[in-house]
């Protein structure tokens, strides 16, 4: 299981400061760049993180018509990121079109599909998608696997189930991890490290519990040690 840190600080300077503080762990860590950081800091920020030796996950959750998604995927691949995501609900044609566009790259980024945002409660999810999170997560995972994607973004509660219906090597990445039971904030379906490991999660994403900690480096060390222990 790998640790991916969400760089969601209010300034580029704060994000770079954190990345520099953790540089000795660059080979063990992934850094997630989301909407806020990418819109504000752009491609140059990605390059700076890559120069420090980090693996970068660009979290933009592409969702559009197939050709537009494929165009965006190509530009993302050109940035040199190591992983990015799309929405599974964009549909099979869109997912396949994205993967076909990336075939020309000798080393392409990993592509994951978002099943259900971890901020959703089951009740809220049903109002929009007409079914339970569990059922739709299964459906979206199968769809993504059949389209040739590398994995999905899901909560820890769906991870093992998804691997059982797709492939053990099909990647699951889980946001909203609260390593040691920290406040859930705006996340509805959170998990700690032990549950994530038990559910065979491949990547855990941790943001606020690290970058809001008084000693982020010590917190990261504690998380990495916990991952190795279990």
Curated annotation (Swiss-Prot):
GO terms for cellular component: cytosol. One of its GO terms (molecular function) is orotidine-5'-phosphate decarboxylase activity. It comes from the Bacteria. InterPro entries: Aldolase_TIM (IPR013785), OMPdecase (IPR014732), OMPdecase_AS (IPR018089), OMPdecase_bac (IPR047596), OMPdeCOase_dom (IPR001754), RibuloseP-bd_barrel (IPR011060). It is an enzyme of class 4 (lyase). It catalyses: orotidine 5'-phosphate + H(+) = UMP + CO2. Catalyzes the decarboxylation of orotidine 5'-monophosphate (OMP) to uridine 5'-monophosphate (UMP). This is Orotidine 5'-phosphate decarboxylase. It comes from Nautilia profundicola (strain ATCC BAA-1463 / DSM 18972 / AmH). The gene is pyrF.
